[in-house]
Amino acid sequence: MKIMRKLILLLTVILLPLVANAHDIEVKNADGVTIYYNYTNDGTELAVTFRGKYYTDYLDEYTGKVVIPEEVTCMDNTRKVTSIGESAFSYCKELTSVTIPNSVTSIAESAFL
C-alpha cells in the first residue's frame, strides 16, 4: 500500500507541470520580451496567448511595447505566428503598443480587452 501511495504521489508531481499552464511554449522576441504561444493547425502554426492557466493569473504580463515576430523557432522547429488568441493581451494596462506581423490573419474576440 505504501508503494502505491508513493507511486501516485510521484506521478502527480511529474504530471502537475504539464497541466499548470495554458500556453504551450514561451519564447523571447528580439527585444527580450517573453511571448507566450499555443500551437494551432495541428501544431504547424502558433497563436499568441496569455501566461498561466487563466488570463487573470498574470494580469499585466505584457507591458510597454511588444513586437510579435512573424515566425518563432523553438526546439529547432520554426512555426509561423498566424493569430492572436482570446484574451492574449486582456487587462494589460501597461501595454503601450503591439506590432503585429503580416503573418497574423486572425485576432480572437477580446484579445485586447
Can you say where each PLM-predicted feature lies in the sequence?
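Short, Lys/Arg-enriched N-terminal segments with co-localized hydrophobic residues
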Residues: M1-I3
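Sec-dependent signal peptide recognition
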Residues: R5-L11
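Hydrophobic h-region of N-terminal signal peptides that target proteins for export
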Residues: T12-N21
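Boundary at the C-terminal end of the N-terminal hydrophobic targeting segment
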Residues: A20-G32
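Short, ordered beta-strand-loop transition motifs
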Residues: N29-E45
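Structural signature of tandem-repeat unit edges
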Residues: N41-G43, E61-S83, K93-S106
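Non-globular, low-complexity intrinsically disordered regions
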Residues: A47-R51
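Consensus positions within tandem repeat domains that build extended binding/scaffold surfaces
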Residues: G85-A88, A108-L113
